[in-house]
């Protein structure tokens, strides 16, 4: 996972509240067995509307999504985060997030910043005035900025640290690799242990 300290790019206004994970990515796409290639499934039902932002050239390559309250609610599916990232989003700002979605985002390298509803309206107004507006989401300073506009956001310290360091669950575990190895070597031989993968298993 790549470290994130700052995200700068085109911002998209998603003027919807209560956007659940099924609206982010419908269930039929969950059968895929890879963690990439979900950009075509993002907001699949809504993108059938030619006026939806995904179909607007001005928002091509967008990296920041500004949504209404209660974004990412509903069932737990990491695919929702994968779809947003595969499309190109690196940060989402909203007054409230589904707890599980927010947790999944921090583990997958998607910055989720909590802003007030008034500040969301300010951001939307700026984006309406200048479609394709570039927005900078600064994780170090915890502020989103555009010319003449500065909006603070909240993010818990643990998730902020993981994003700044670029630590997914595997990388977080590997920070303690020496301690884990020492513990394994000190266990009795008859106890269950983690063994290196055999070459044949790696080939499969």
Curated annotation (Swiss-Prot):
The keyword Transit peptide does not apply. GO terms for molecular function: 3-isopropylmalate dehydratase activity. It comes from the Bacteria. Belongs to the LeuD family. LeuD type 1 subfamily. It is an enzyme of class 4 (lyase). GO terms for biological process: L-leucine biosynthetic process. Heterodimer of LeuC and LeuD. Keywords: Amino-acid biosynthesis, Branched-chain amino acid biosynthesis, Leucine biosynthesis, Lyase. One of its GO terms (cellular component) is 3-isopropylmalate dehydratase complex. It comes from Clavibacter sepedonicus. InterPro entries: 3-IsopropMal_deHydase_ssu (IPR004431), Aconitase/3IPM_dehydase_swvl (IPR015928), AconitaseA/IPMdHydase_ssu_swvl (IPR000573), IPMI_Swivel (IPR033940), LeuD (IPR050075). Pathway: Amino-acid biosynthesis; L-leucine biosynthesis; L-leucine from 3-methyl-2-oxobutanoate: step 2/4. This is 3-isopropylmalate dehydratase small subunit. Pfam families: Aconitase_C. Catalyzes the isomerization between 2-isopropylmalate and 3-isopropylmalate, via the formation of 2-isopropylmaleate. The keyword Ribosomal protein does not apply. Its EC number is 4.2.1.33. It catalyses: (2R,3S)-3-isopropylmalate = (2S)-2-isopropylmalate. Gene3D superfamilies: Aconitase, domain 4.
């Amino acid at each position: 996972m790549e470290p994130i300290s700052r995200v700068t790019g085109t911002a998209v206004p998603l003027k919807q509240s209560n956007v659940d994970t099924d609206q982010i990515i419908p269930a039929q796409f969950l059968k895929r067995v890879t963690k990439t290639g979900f950009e075509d499934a993002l907001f699949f039902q809504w993108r059938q509307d030619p006026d939806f932002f995904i179909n607007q050239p001005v928002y091509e390559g967008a990296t920041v999504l500004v949504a209404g309250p209660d974004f990412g609610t509903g069932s737990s599916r990491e695919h929702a985060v994968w779809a947003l990232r595969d499309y190109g989003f690196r940060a989402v700002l909203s007054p409230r997030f589904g707890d599980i979605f927010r947790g999944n985002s921090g583990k997958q390298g998607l910055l989720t910043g909590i802003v007030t509803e008034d500040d969301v309206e300010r951001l939307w107004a700026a984006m309406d005035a200048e479609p394709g507006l570039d927005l900078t989401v600064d994780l170090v300073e915890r502020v989103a900025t555009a010319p003449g506009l500065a909006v603070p956001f909240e993010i818990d310290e643990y998730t902020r640290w993981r994003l700044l360091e670029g630590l997914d669950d595997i990388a977080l575990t590997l920070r303690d690799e020496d301690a884990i190895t020492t513990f394994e070597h000190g266990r009795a031989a008859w106890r269950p242990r983690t063994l290196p993968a055999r070459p044949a298993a790696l080939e499969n």
